Amino acid sequence: MAAPSGRSQSSLHRKGLMAADRRSRILAVCGMHPDHQETLKKNRVVLAKQLLLSELLEHLLEKDIITLEMRELIQAKGGSFSQNVELLNLLPKRGPQAFDAFCEALRETRQGHLEDLLLTTLSDIQHVLPPLSCDYDTSLPFSVCESCPPHKQLRLSTDATEHSLDNGDGPPCLLVKPCTPEFYQAHYQLAYRLQSQPRGLALVLSNVHFTGEKDLEFRSGGDVDHTTLVTLFKLLGYNVHVLHDQTAQEMQEKLQNFAQLPAHRVTDSCVVALLSHGVEGGIYGVDGKLLQLQEVFRLFDNANCPSLQNKPKMFFIQACRGDETDRGVDQQDGKNHTQSPGCEESDAGKEELMKMRLPTRSDMICGYACLKGNAAMRNTKRGSWYIEALTQVFSERACDMHVADMLVKVNALIKEREGYAPGTEFHRCKEMSEYCSTLCQQLYLFPGYPPT
């Protein structure tokens, strides 16, 4: 066979370079985020020792993270440790969605403690998130499940598609505006002290998968709320702790452990966010048993949590407080409000309403997704109305507005929303959030100030 000519060799070389360039560009688009890779690396030994793969691999296969050939390659390794190592070698090469899908699979296979470990590490790594392009959309395709009024609709960029709006992969755009030195100097003397680094500890507890005899459904969209809040609190300067799918007893025990952490002594505030099904005065564990909110507040009161005495404590409750859907009333001579097209669901439990008293505590403020007796609305793709509004307001106005006033703005956003789910009880439904406060001073979060 004749040797290739110089021209042929040059052509082959160019084609090889083009192919390499294509592979490079594909990896740039499809590779795992560096923070996710670093998170897996930092927990590699623990994961290699503790992962239980038999069911986990099926979940990853279903999510198109691994192929049948990859599953066979992993299973061909001798011993669980070697199999786990092989999976950990593959994951960083399986695209930008692989980390989130892996975390979800851990949760679905009752390995939530490993997911918590990964998310806590990720929060520690992401001290400062780079700003993302963010603007507001004025029109949305009908296929989007739920939206704010058009002028409030967040999107990724000017050419965002409908998939980027409701794929549930996390907050579409989140950037907290920093407080200016001038604003801080003008307000800090009349407000709670908020200067510690971190500002305080934050706990985000999200129950999504329920078992037991209660008729409590999977909280589709709950993962979006969790991811959004973890990101928001991190950007506001908090050290975030995460918990998933806890029984009522586990919630009580872990909330108590969180309240007793020594770090509260040297920080200036505390945040607790609880996301679950609920009734008036209580929230459900994944076992269908109730944890009374009275008990939650008791754990952080002045008697039981002296480390937080005279410090502001913020609570956010995304759960129903009853099972009544607010049908709303016609507004006299009112403007036509844009509907919120969506796959609406309710966080109400399917049992008789339980009445529980809510105690008054000092230096606390608690935001509720809905009024007493009512159900809270949650979109199966975008997450709950309340958490979406809370995130929008806090990211935009924490720089120049105190928390109580921000919660008033959250109320205003929730008031404008209207469900869109033709043929269901949630079509044209309404929701009204509220808050109660025993704060004794103005509570400014002063994001980004003083500079670290």
From Swiss-Prot:
PTM-bearing positions, type N-acetylalanine: A2
EC numbers for this chain: 3.4.22.55
Domain of life: Eukaryota
A GO term from the CC aspect: cytoplasm
Catalysed reactions, as listed in the record: Strict requirement for an Asp residue at P1, with 316-Asp being essential for proteolytic activity and has a preferred cleavage sequence of Val-Asp-Val-Ala-Asp-|-
Keywords, sorted A to Z: Acetylation, Apoptosis, Hydrolase, Phosphoprotein, Protease, Thiol protease, Zymogen
Limits of the CARD domain: 32-121
Residue stretches of biased makeup (Basic and acidic residues): 327-336
Active site, per annotation: H277, C320
Gene3D superfamilies: 3.40.50.1460, Caspase-like, Death Domain, Fas
GO biological process terms, semicolon-separated: apoptotic signaling pathway; cellular response to mechanical stimulus; DNA damage response; DNA damage response, signal transduction by p53 class mediator; ectopic germ cell programmed cell death; extrinsic apoptotic signaling pathway in absence of ligand; luteolysis; negative regulation of apoptotic process
Propeptide feature: residues: 2-169
PROSITE patterns assigned to the protein according to its UniProt record, in alphabetical order: CARD (PS50209), CASPASE_CYS (PS01122), CASPASE_HIS (PS01121), CASPASE_P10 (PS50207), CASPASE_P20 (PS50208)
Modified residue annotations for Phosphoserine: S157, S340
Region (Disordered): 327-349
PTM characteristics: The mature protease can process its own propeptide, but not that of other caspases.
Entry text on domains: The CARD domain mediates a direct interaction with CRADD.
PANTHER family listed in its UniProt record: CASPASE 2, CASPASE RECRUITMENT DOMAIN-CONTAINING PROTEIN 18
Subunit structure and binding partners: Heterotetramer that consists of two anti-parallel arranged heterodimers, each one formed by a p18 subunit and a p12 subunit. Forms a complex named the PIDDosome with PIDD1 and CRADD. Interacts with NOL3 (via CARD domain); inhibits CASP2 activity in a phosphorylation-dependent manner.
Similarity comment: family membership: Belongs to the peptidase C14A family.
Function: Involved in the activation cascade of caspases responsible for apoptosis execution. Might function by either activating some proteins required for cell death or inactivating proteins necessary for cell survival. Associates with PIDD1 and CRADD to form the PIDDosome, a complex that activates CASP2 and triggers apoptosis in response to genotoxic stress.
Name of the protein in its database record: Caspase-2
